[in-house]
Amino acid sequence: VSPSYPAPYNDPSQWGIVPAWGFASIEESNIPELTPGTLLHGFWPTSSAPTDLKLQASEPSGNWVEISEHRQQLMGFYNRYTVIKTSLPVSAILDAQHVSSSYQDELDRLGWLAHFQAIWRAGYFLARYVFPSQKEQKPIYPLGDVAGVPWTKEDADLSSAVVVSLSAAGKTARSFAYSFERRSKETAPLGFLQVTSAVEGLSQATQSAAPPFPSKTIGYGDLSDEELVQWIKDLGPSKFVILDFGARDGALKRLLEIIKVKASLEASKIVIIQIGSQQKVLIIGSPLIL
């Protein structure tokens, strides 16, 4: 929050602004390549107030990195800003409801970009760099190098693993699956299990992708099914990589019980990566509404 905001909302230790992926137009700049009117895509506070950025040129051309000290503990993903070339005047973007119909296609393109670009990148980075799809690729810790935590080739190795996607129909999970199901045989897992409330749609998507490894899609209610237990046993994994994209309450616990008790794989190494959380709305004075 800005110190110029009225009290008490100018206290950054108590207040903040919810961020979101989207676009902003440059109003003032001391970087010659970024002139006023340039459109940037990135992570912004959901506010009409001006935002100050300290940007440094990056690769490829048109990409910029926020290097302010207070943002250095963020994943690099959140500090990257991209110049977006568009034929639309800024006024049309700010007042899309009254824009000429001739600009509608371009507005639609920007809308899709705002909604899906960050989600698509998140899933791609996870499939491509955290668990590299090429053996010679150096793996990167899930929170990025900024975390300072080692992530070795052994950590990223999936050759003896079953990979599990919880809340597999979520947007980030779908992005991950799209890239993951198209990796080569040499970096393939033993199997890929998707747990979702949209079994039919995901099953069709996986069938179309034709991944080079066994894949199974089940509903939350099928987690304790004997057929699933046998499927896991037949694969003979010594490692489970569980990607929790925001599963229903209790899903992760039930899965761990199946692995350790029903499938008799208590000696297996288990890696859990929490990527999302179940959305909940809490109304003060009322029960929790899901």
Residue ranges of model-derived segments:
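Gly/Ser/Thr-rich loops at beta-strand to alpha-helix junctions
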Residues: S47, S167-R174, A198-V199, A247-G250
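Glycine-rich beta-strand-centered segment in the early N-terminal region that forms part
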Residues: S2-A57
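Conserved adenosyl
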Residues: Q134-V162, L166, R174-T196, T206-P212
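NAD(P)H dinucleotide-binding glycine-rich loop of Rossmann-like/cofactor-binding domains
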Residues: F43-S160
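Redox-cofactor binding/interface segments in oxidoreductases and associated redox assembly factors
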Residues: G42, L243-F245, Q274
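Adenosine-nucleotide cofactor-binding segment
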Residues: K185-L252
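Glycine-rich phosphate-binding loop and adjacent beta-alpha segment
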Residues: K253-L290
